[in-house]
Amino acid sequence: MNVKIKDLLPIGSIVILKDGEQPLMIYGIMQRDGDGGLFKKAKEYDYVSVLYPQGHLGHGMTFLFNHEDIKEIIFRGYENEERTKFLNELSEQYEKQ
């Protein structure tokens, strides 16, 4: 993760990735790709998303990516005090690791 937690886009944000054309809607942050298995560590991504406007189309149709992969932010999702508190708590947890 190269982006600071407080700089992550909010859920509901819609982006286009570099080398991409289809908009994606972010529905989660700080996601892991699987459990890593016996001999490898799970890879962590900044975001998990689905196609927009289609939404979730089934298994294998979610997209994990990092902030640096974003080419364009089309829409910034909803932000409020609860989100700020959540990001502060998340940031504290990562600092402990």
Predicted features, each with a name:
Residues 14, 21-32:
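Short beta-strand-centered aromatic/proline hotspots
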Residues 46-97:
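Intrinsically disordered, low-complexity, charged/polar segments
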Residues 2, 14, 60:
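Short, flexible active-site loop motifs that bind/organize anionic cofactors or intermediates
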Residues 7, 14-17, 40:
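A general structural signal for short secondary-structure junctions and capping/turn motifs
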Residues 32-44:
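Short, solvent-exposed secondary-structure boundary/capping segments
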Residues 1-11:
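Mixed-charge, Lys/Arg-rich low-complexity intrinsically disordered regions
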Residues 10, 19, 44-45:
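Short connector loops at helix/strand junctions that flank enzyme active sites
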